[in-house]
Amino acid sequence: MTYFPHTPQEIKEMLNTIGLESIEDLFSEIPEEIRQKAKENFKIPASPSEIDLLEEIKNIARKNIGKDYISFLGGGAYKHYIPPFVKLVSLFPTFYTAYTPYQPEISQGVLQSIFEYQSLICDLTGMEVANASLYEAGSGIAEAALMSVRITGKKEVIASSGLNPEYISVLKTYLQAQNIELKIIPLDEKGETDVDFLEKNISPKTSGVIIQNPNFFGVIETKLKDIEELIHKNNALFILSIYPISLGILKPPSEYNVDIVVGEGQSLGIPLGFGGPYLGILATKKEFIRQIPGRIVGETIDLEGERGFVNTLQTREQHIRRAKATSNICTNEALSAISAAVYMAILGKKGIKKIAEVCFSRAHYLRERMQKEVNLEITYPNSHFFNEFVIKIPENSENFLKKLEEKKILGGIPLSRFYKDRDKEILVAVTERNSLEELEYYIKSLKEVLKKN
C-alpha cells in the first residue's frame, strides 16, 4: 500500500465522478458564515522547511527537564537499565507492527514470542497461566476485579489503600458503571494493610480482595498469609498487584496461594513514557483460564506434526457475543510484551535477582543516610521496604522539590498530588540506575536546601 497524496488530476477525476466542481462543494451543506468563521479562527501558517521544523521541535523539547537530571521518581514507573539488545530485537520488522497476529500461518514468530512471554511471566510469578498482555497495571487490576465477580457471582470488591491511587481511580471507573461495590481498607501504623479492619469488613458477599506488594508507599506487606486465609475463608479471590523486579528477592505470589496476579510490566525493559505504552501483566490459576480477559497464545501441533502457535481462548467481544465476552479489551500490548520477554530472557533469574538486590541495598543506604545525616523524618520507619520509601520535610513538598530541580535532581513524587492532607511528604524511589555518586549528591543537595530554610 502506498501513502502518496492524491494528484490534482486524481482529485479532478473523483470530483467529476460525484458531479462536483471543487472540494469546497463537499461542504456546501454547512452555512457560508460558519465556514468563513472557521477559516478565520483556524488560520494555518505556511509549512516551514524541514530544517526550521526540526529546530522548532527542539526548542519546544528544551522546555522539558532533560535526561541529565538525576531521577528518584517511582510510584509505578521506574528508571531501570534497558540492555540495547532489547531494543534491537523489538525493532525487528517482524515484531515492530500494530498488526494483530490473527493469521497463524504467517505469524509464527510473533506468536511464539508472545508464548515465551507468557511462560516467563508464569516462571516469575509461580502462576499456572498468563495472558498475552493488557494495557497497563490500572486496567489489569480492574480486569482482575471483574474476573473475581464473574467467577464468584458476587458484586463486592475490597481494595487496600496501599494500592496505587491511580489504579484505584481506574478501578472505580470500571466498577461503578457495573454497580459493583468497592470498599477501601486503610493502612495500619506500619503502612501495611490493616488486617483487623479487613476482617471486620470482608464477608461472604465479597468477590475479591486486592493488595499491592510492595504497596504504593514502598512498604512490604508482611501479613500476606493471614490475609490469604481471611480471603479464602470467605470464599473470595486473592488478587495481588506486584512490582516484577521485586520478585527477584521476594517470594513469588504462588507461595501465598494468590488467585490472580496483576502488575505493571514497564520495569521489564520498557522505557519511561508519558502516556505509555506500558504493559499490563495478568496471571492466574489454570482453573480460571476461561475467565481471563484478552487472549492467550497456545502451543499446538499442525497437520504435518510440527509444533505451532495460535491465538486461543479469545473470549473477547469482537469474537463472541458481547454478553458472553470476558472483556472488551481489544488490541493488546504485544510489542511491549515481546520487549519484556527479551529483557527477562537476557537477564534470567540471576540477573533479575541481582538488580533487585542492588535496588534494595541502595534504597536502604539512602534512607539510612537521610535519617542519620540529614535528620529527615521517615514515614513508616519500622516497616520493611523494597526500593521506595516516604520522607517528611519541613515545608510544602512541591516547593521543596522545585528547589531540588534547580540542582538537577528529581527528588521524588509529592504525596499531595494524591492526598491533599499529605503536603509535606515525598515518595522516593531508588533503582540500579542511581549510582553511589548520585546518592551522595542527593544527600549533599538535601542538606543545602534544608539549610536555606
From Swiss-Prot:
Keywords: Oxidoreductase. Belongs to the GcvP family. N-terminal subunit subfamily. It catalyses: N(6)-[(R)-lipoyl]-L-lysyl-[glycine-cleavage complex H protein] + glycine + H(+) = N(6)-[(R)-S(8)-aminomethyldihydrolipoyl]-L-lysyl-[glycine-cleavage complex H protein] + CO2. The glycine cleavage system catalyzes the degradation of glycine. The P protein binds the alpha-amino group of glycine through its pyridoxal phosphate cofactor; CO(2) is released and the remaining methylamine moiety is then transferred to the lipoamide cofactor of the H protein. It comes from Dictyoglomus thermophilum (strain ATCC 35947 / DSM 3960 / H-6-12). One of its GO terms (biological process) is nucleoside metabolic process. This is Probable glycine dehydrogenase (decarboxylating) subunit 1. It is an enzyme of class 1 (oxidoreductase). CDD domains: GDC-P (cd00613). The glycine cleavage system is composed of four proteins: P, T, L and H. In this organism, the P 'protein' is a heterodimer of two subunits.
